Regions:
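Extended, H/D-rich, highly charged conserved domains that either
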Residues: 172, 177-180
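Active-site-adjacent substructure of cysteine-protease-like catalytic cores
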Residues: 232-314, 322, 450-451
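Noncatalytic regulatory segments and standalone regulatory/sensor domains
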Residues: 1-149, 291-526
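Second-shell loop/turn segments in exported
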Residues: 162-171, 215-217
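Catalytic-core signature of thiol
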Residues: 2-21, 156-158, 178, 188-249, ...
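Active-site catalytic microenvironments for nucleophilic, acid-base chemistry
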Residues: 183, 187, 291-294
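Active-site-adjacent bridging/hinge elements
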Residues: 144-161
Length: 526
């Protein structure tokens, strides 16, 4: 029997693709609405939206995650469960040959044609195993930030797909929490150099010290304490964020607070495990991986005001999460790259969230809430000090009215930060400072943007007028910032033409300030 088979399909035809998959499923006849097939149905819908025209079936795949599940559980069955899987690779070019190797070679010469793969387990209840597919095509409405590039080898040819791994729980070796943890660990493995456990290993790590119900089969899922233990064992720093009291009704205030709390991690590309408890339903875990963009939000989320010298007209600060709608999730129960609405009856929503656990690295001692609060305080103190210099200097300069601002906080690798600065339209002297300044491996960045035009951020047409950098391995209460950059829009002189950088030496704490070009530049677009 040939290990490879080639199929041509009509782009956008979901029914045709579903019909192709049916013979590969252990239980034949995938029926719409059947919970066990809902993830696969939504996956088919996503593949169709990517414009798939060719499918390469690869048989007898030794999928490492299913092999681990098989060893731990399925090999113990009296009924013989196969050890190997089927894998389907998708391309947006039409196959022009019946010879699989010729098709593979042609597609390898057109690398952009590769859309990713879906692995099918040889079990009836939960057939969809390791899946990596490109995100949705509409980049201006879908910002999938927790992702990586994955290398795929097929018959000697190498392919690459950028996406977020997805897996359906098998409801035996692992439930929803294990599936979400697997997705996050697999996404972060190359970037962070940490372990990428199989679902069986995740269950073992999670139940090492605390056991509730049966460990195998683990149909009852995991509690928060078990989830955090699995993360700690995998080399991450568990950090539980409370979002809503269990039993408390979701309100506009709790949903807004949840969006504010989660957004900095999502914008940082950090996967976040969110625990949902819908009304009159069992708890469920999903993985937060990105967000959409609403150019015209119904209201703006306030970050507070900055009052300078007891002014009656404070500087208004709004939060960048105001424009974030919806969040995007991987939901092992329903499928990949799906929206998480704010509040919707009969569907998982942000209002159902009671807590969240970001996959923070071990060297991050300052969380997002602390970083944002600290940077806002540093901004207020800096503007107050600069205002006093102008007021007490006797220069006769008019103190101007400050613009309304939007702040956005995220964690960023220093190499990524420097690359973004280098490619930006920031003034050269400010660029040179950031390129040569010592920075830790990762930094908290709080962007300072003008509210005017901020809705155009995805197009790079908004105006960034400064940023504050914070060392995540420091003590914010002791003033351990790295630098504060304020453009001319933030200086109190009515005719200010230059900006200022306040630089702090990370080793001895020495602080110096110097003038730099004061032009505006665009916020980061990931």
């Amino acid at each position: 029997m040939e290990r490879f088979e080639v199929y041509r399909i009509t782009a956008g035809d979901e029914a045709e693709l579903a019909q192709l998959l049916q013979p590969l499923l252990v239980t034949k006849g995938m029926k719409s609405g059947s919970p066990r097939y809902t993830p696969l149905e939504n996956t088919i819908r996503h593949i169709s939206s990517l414009g798939a025209k060719s499918v390469l079936l690869q048989k007898d795949v030794q999928d490492p995650d299913f092999l681990a599940e098989h060893t731990a559980y399925y090999s113990k069955w009296s009924y013989k469960v196969p050890r190997f899987c089927d894998r389907l690779h998708f391309f947006d070019l039409e196959a022009d040959s019946e010879d699989p190797l010729e098709v593979i070679d042609k597609m390898a010469a057109n690398q952009d044609s590769y859309l990713g793969f879906v692995t099918l387990r040889p079990i009836s209840v939960s057939p969809q195993a390791a899946t990596i597919l490109k995100p949705p095509n509409n980049d201006t409405k879908h910002f999938i930030l927790s992702k990586d590039d994955f290398q795929v080898n097929i018959a000697g040819q190498g392919f690459s797909v950028a996406g977020t791994p997805f897996m359906q729980q098998d409801n035996a070796v692992g439930a929803c929490a294990q599936a979400s943890i697997w997705m996050a660990l697999r996404t972060l493995r190359r970037k962070e150099g940490q372990s990428a456990f199989s679902p069986a290993q995740i269950t073992t790590a999670a139940t090492r010290f605390l056991v509730r119900g049966r460990t195998l089969p683990n149909r009852g899922g995991l509690v928060v304490e078990q989830i955090t233990e699995a993360l700690r064992t995998a080399g991450y720093s568990p950090h539980t964020i409370p979002l809503r009291e269990l039993g408390q009704d979701a309100t506009e205030e709790t949903i807004t607070a949840s969006r504010q709390a989660l957004y900095p991690y999502v914008e940082s590309g950090i996967p976040v495990l969110v625990l949902l408890f819908p009304k009159d339903a069992e708890g469920h875990a999903v993985l937060l991986i990105g967000h959409g963009w609403d150019k015209e939000p119904a209201s703006f989320i306030k970050n507070g005001d900055i009052r300078i010298d007891s002014s009656e007209n404070p500087i208004e600060l709004y939060d960048a999460s105001s424009w974030v709608a919806p969040f995007f999730i991987h939901n092992d129960n329903t499928g990949p790259y799906l929206p998480l609405p704010d509040n919707m009856e009969g569907q998982y929503s942000l209002g159902d969230a009671v807590s969240a656990i970001p996959f923070l690295q071990l060297d991050i001692f300052v969380d997002a809430a602390e970083a944002k609060l600290t940077c806002h305080r540093l901004l207020a103190d800096s503007l107050e000090d600069l205002n006093k210099l102008v007021s007490n200097g006797g220069t006769g300069e008019q103190v101007k009215e400050f613009p309304v601002l939007v702040t956005r906080t995220y964690l960023q690798d220093k190499s990524e930060f420097r690359a973004a600065i280098l490619s930006s339209d920031m003034e050269k002297d400010a660029k040179d400072f950031y390129r040569s300044k010592w920075l830790p491996k990762r930094i908290w960045v709080t962007e300072i943007n003008l509210l005017d035009g901020y809705s155009e951020s995805p197009e790079g047409e908004a105006y960034r007028v400064g940023e504050i950098l914070l060392d995540p391995a420091s003590e914010p209460e002791d003033g351990h910032f790295l630098s504060i950059h304020l453009g001319s829009d933030l200086l109190p002189h009515a005719k200010a033409a230059t900006g200022v950088i306040i630089d702090r030496n990370a080793f001895d704490g020495e602080i110096r300030a110097f003038a730099v070009g004061g032009s505006r530049y665009a916020p980061l677009v990931r």
